[in-house]
């Protein structure tokens, strides 16, 4: 079933399940970029505070089950299968005709309920107002990350329209944290939405770089100014971290969360597929990044170009895209003279048959105007052959364009997530 935004099916499904979402406290996170990192910072910090915590993120990386984590582990096959069967049975019995994403989301809530989770960190799937995750009457906190143009067919063609949709997670008397470096028109819309919903207090989160690499200085209402060190790479992590730390500071008024819990949690955070450098046998280091829109490409380019200056290397880009992406715009940001592009596709996505991979030839044609780069298609090559070809062309290899492509790569290469 294709994407069908709306809450009626989801609310009916949850009602017939006994409303499992009412059994835990929810931290809701919406936005275009950075949601997953923010989720992970909060999740690992809550675990450091010995709070039984769940996390729900999407899309899945290797399999649908990995969208659901409980107390530091991906949901076990036993609990996932049990809860999935319960959800499917209820959906069939009451003919709610829920979408795949709604079924998976309900399964996550059912897993959290049966596991006795106290706090669940919930990433919005798309948008906010009509997303299947937006079923909490009174979450403990709402967070909005960086907002950019993406999914315009569903959310609107302007940043203001998209911001309004994402602000649909705001609830009366529930505090909200917003990435303070969003564009002014976005911040104005979010403030207006918060006022209309009577969501308050309204916090703008901002971080600044510290003395050392991957070190950030963040000021929060209760803890004041502190320094945090993260293993996650990229300048944009400063803002993701600022949102997470501000959120945790606010949560500390209701839960036993101390500053050292957060500092240790941040140090131990991992998030696969985002500036993720992995050592692959016989191929050496490969950088995997899920950048699939222009803003994410800009951040990836910043990181890659800093490495280019240091090592004076051209890059081999292994890319695949869903069939609605602006390949020309994204690759124009990434490519430099002497680079190589190998266009491929990703396999069918479990539970999401409407997600289609762009044909490699279409990708090639979209960037053929970049005459200073070589471009190949890899229709009939295995993943090993694709990566070997990329390595032969340039010692620096980057895989990007789609998390679904990264999922294929991680499965094939048996990389940990």
From Swiss-Prot:
Its EC number is 6.3.2.12. ATP binds at residues 34-37, 274, 289. One of its GO terms (biological process) is one-carbon metabolic process. SUPFAM superfamilies: MurD-like peptide ligases, catalytic domain, MurD-like peptide ligases, peptide-binding domain. It is an enzyme of class 6 (ligase). Transmembrane segments: none annotated. Belongs to the folylpolyglutamate synthase family. This is Probable dihydrofolate synthetase. It comes from Schizosaccharomyces pombe (strain 972 / ATCC 24843) (Fission yeast).
């Amino acid at each position: 079933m294709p994407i069908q935004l709306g809450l009626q099916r989801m609310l009916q499904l949850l009602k017939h399940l006994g409303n499992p979402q009412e059994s835990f406290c929810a931290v809701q996170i919406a936005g275009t970029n950075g949601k997953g990192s923010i989720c992970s910072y909060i999740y690992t910090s809550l675990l450091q505070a010995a709070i039984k915590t769940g996390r729900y993120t999407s899309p899945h990386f290797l399999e649908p089950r990995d969208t659901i984590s409980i107390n530091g582990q991906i949901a076990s096959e036993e609990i996932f299968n049990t809860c999935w069967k319960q959800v499917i049975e209820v959906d069939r019995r009451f003919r709610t005709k829920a979408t795949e994403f709604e079924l998976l989301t309900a399964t996550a809530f059912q897993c959290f309920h049966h596991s006795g989770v106290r706090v669940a960190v919930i990433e919005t799937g798309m948008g906010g107002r009509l997303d299947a995750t937006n079923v909490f009457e009174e979450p403990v906190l709402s967070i909005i990350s960086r907002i950019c143009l993406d999914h315009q067919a569903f959310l609107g063609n302007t940043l203001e329209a998209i911001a309004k949709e994402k602000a649909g997670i705001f609830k009366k008397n529930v505090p909200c944290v917003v990435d303070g470096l969003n564009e002014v028109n976005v911040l104005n819309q979010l403030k207006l939405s918060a006022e209309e919903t009577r969501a308050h207090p309204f916090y703008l989160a901002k971080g600044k770089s510290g003395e050392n690499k991957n070190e950030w200085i963040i000021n929060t209402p209760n803890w004041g100014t502190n320094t945090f060190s993260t293993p996650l790479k990229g300048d944009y992590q400063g803002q993701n971290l600022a949102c997470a730390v501000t959120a945790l500071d606010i949560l500390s008024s209701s839960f036993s969360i101390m500053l050292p819990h957060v500092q240790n949690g941040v140090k131990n955070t991992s998030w696969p597929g985002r500036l993720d450098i992995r050592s692959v046998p016989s191929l050496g280091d490969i950088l995997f990044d899920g950048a699939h829109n222009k803003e994410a490409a800009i951040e990836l380019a910043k990181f890659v170009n800093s490495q280019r200056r240091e090592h004076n290397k051209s890059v081999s880009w292994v890319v695949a895209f869903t069939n609605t992406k602006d390949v020309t715009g994204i690759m124009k940001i990434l490519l430099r003279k002497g680079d190589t592009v190998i266009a491929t596709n990703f396999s069918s996505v479990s539970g999401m048959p409407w997600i289609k991979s762009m044909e490699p030839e279409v990708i090639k044609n979209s960037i053929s105007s970049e005459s200073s780069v070589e471009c190949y298609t890899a229709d009939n090559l295995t993943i090993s052959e694709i990566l070997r070809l990329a390595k032969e062309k340039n010692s620096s290899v980057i895989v990007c364009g789609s998390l679904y492509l990264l999922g294929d790569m991680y499965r094939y290469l048996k990389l940990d997530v």
